[in-house]
Design a protein with these regions (language model features):
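Short hydrophobic segments within beta-strands
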Residues: 10, 92-94, 122
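Short, low-order "capping/linker" segments at domain edges
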Residues: 85-104
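Short internal beta-strands
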Residues: 116-127
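Short loop/helix-cap segments at secondary-structure boundaries that form the rim of catalytic
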Residues: 129-134, 184-186
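Adenosine-nucleotide cofactor-binding segment
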Residues: 133, 137-165
Length: 287
């Protein structure tokens, strides 16, 4: 498979952006293999994802970022990110005691669905070490006291591990701890959470029990980027399933677990493929 460059950009909408960027690529012998764009009419913003093959491309990789900055970013007031398909993201998974999302992520990774590396799994409990062992992934445990008196110390150790392993992004696979503002600042829009409800409904703990008490007719799951405000980050993926008055809190939990696995895996896949742009508190998901 040919190595490709992936350019994600957004800027105020104006005439000629697509033409300028595609001409720059083709004039330098790049073969464009993907292009998707969107205009937000309300805010007047332009968003684009473009990918091209690097074989025969005239501009060296170590110069490309500077070229784009000089030629287009300043001129169009453009913000952009540049990635390469042969540089695999490195994902850390954080878990607590529930295994369903962890198993699903690791099975998909083992099957080749995720083009990434998983150097470590981090937990606040020993419970899921056997899962990590099955897949040959190092498992690190830092227990957090009930009064959270060692939380800062634990996060410092976790951050040292993440930096040592050159982690690109973090997935909270039902990790039942609140991430500090300091860690979020180190990985802005690079920490993915799965919340077991159709946000913004039923935030916080036990959403399935909240849904049962409310008598809702659908339940859902939401994957989002983590921000300082609990369960309020940019939403990446959501799904729902219908329920009836015959469902119990226990049956809702079982149905919800299936949703959580699907929604989280889709969000992770889109992040790995560089198909997500964040703007304000929303995401633009490219096809």
């Amino acid at each position: 498979m040919e190595t490709t460059a992936i350019l994600l950009l957004h800027c105020p909408d104006q005439q000629g952006i697509i033409s300028e960027v595609t001409k720059f690529i083709t004039d330098n012998k790049g073969n464009i293999v993907y292009l998707d764009q969107y205009v937000d009419k309300v805010d007047g913003m332009f968003f684009m994802r473009i990918e091209w093959e690097l074989e025969g491309f005239l501009i060296p990789r170590d110069k490309l970022y500077d070229y784009i900055t000089t030629l287009y970013a300043q001129r169009y007031k453009m913000k952009f990110s540049l990635y390469y398909s042969d540089k695999r993201p490195r994902m850390a998974i954080f878990v607590s005691k529930m295994s369903h999302c962890l198993y699903d992520l690791l099975a998909r990774w083992k099957a080749g669905e995720f083009n990434c590396d998983i150097p470590c799994i981090v937990s606040n409990h020993e419970d899921l070490r056997y899962v990590a062992d099955q897949f040959g992934i190092p498992y690190y445990v830092w227990s957090i006291k009930k009064d959270h008196s060692n939380k800062e110390e634990v996060e410092k150790a976790e951050m040292e591990l993440l930096k040592k392993e050159d982690i690109s992004f973090i997935v909270l696979a039902r990790y039942m701890q609140i991430i500090s503002d300091e860690m979020i600042a180190e990985y802005p829009h690079h920490i993915i959470n799965i919340h077991h409800s159709f946000l913004p409904a039923f935030i916080g703990a036990q959403p399935y029990h909240q849904a049962y008490e409310r008598g809702v007719k659908i339940i859902g799951a939401t994957s989002h980027y983590v921000t300082a405000e609990l369960d309020a980050g940019p939403i990446i993926e959501q799904d729902v399933t219908r329920i009836t008055h015959k469902d119990t809190p226990e049956s809702l939990v079982l149905k919800g677990k299936d949703l959580e696995k699907i929604v989280l895996s889709h969000a992770v896949s889109k992040h790995i493929q560089r198909k997500i742009l964040t703007y304000k508190n929303k995401t633009i998901i490219f096809s």
